[in-house]
UniProtKB/Swiss-Prot annotation:
GO MF term set: double-stranded DNA binding
Protein name: Centromere protein X
Localization in the cell: Nucleus; Chromosome, Centromere; Chromosome, Centromere, Kinetochore
Keyword Magnesium found: no
Assembly: Heterodimer with CENPX, sometimes called MHF; this interaction stabilizes both partners. MHF heterodimers can assemble to form tetrameric structures. MHF also coassemble with CENPT-CENPW heterodimers at centromeres to form the tetrameric CENP-T-W-S-X complex. Forms a discrete complex with FANCM and CENPX, called FANCM-MHF; this interaction, probably mediated by direct binding between CENPS and FANCM, leads to synergistic activation of double-stranded DNA binding and strongly stimulates FANCM-mediated DNA remodeling.
PANTHER family: CENTROMERE PROTEIN X
Species annotation: Bos taurus
Positions of post-translational N-acetylmethionine modification: M1
InterPro entries given in the database record: CENP-X
GO cellular component annotations of the record: chromatin; FANCM-MHF complex; Fanconi anaemia nuclear complex; inner kinetochore
Coiled coil: none
Family named by the database record: Belongs to the CENP-X/MHF2 family.
């Protein structure tokens, strides 16, 4: 299967996960890293889409931080 668009590197995902593990010896399998990377990608794309819709609803031509801040609470609840 060929990847299209941006992806999160496994090293980055691993680093992000390990920053929040209490036990520094915790290991994450390659498959788990791949799944978390895909979840992050879906989350970011969904945040972008919702931010664009929010900007359009406000009659704006560009998305700004304010639109992202408005959609994040519901996005977090949906995930």
């Amino acid at each position: 299967m060929e990847e299209t668009g941006a992806v999160f590197r496994k090293e980055l995902v691993s680093k992000l996960l390990h920053l929040h593990f209490k036990d520094k010896k915790t290991k994450v399998s390659g498959d788990a890293l791949q799944l978390v990377a895909e979840l992050l990608k879906i989350f970011v794309v969904e945040a972008a889409i919702r931010s664009v819709r929010q900007a359009q609803a406000e009659g704006l031509a560009h998305v700004d931080v304010e639109q992202l801040e408005k959609v994040l609470p519901q996005l977090l609840l949906d995930f």
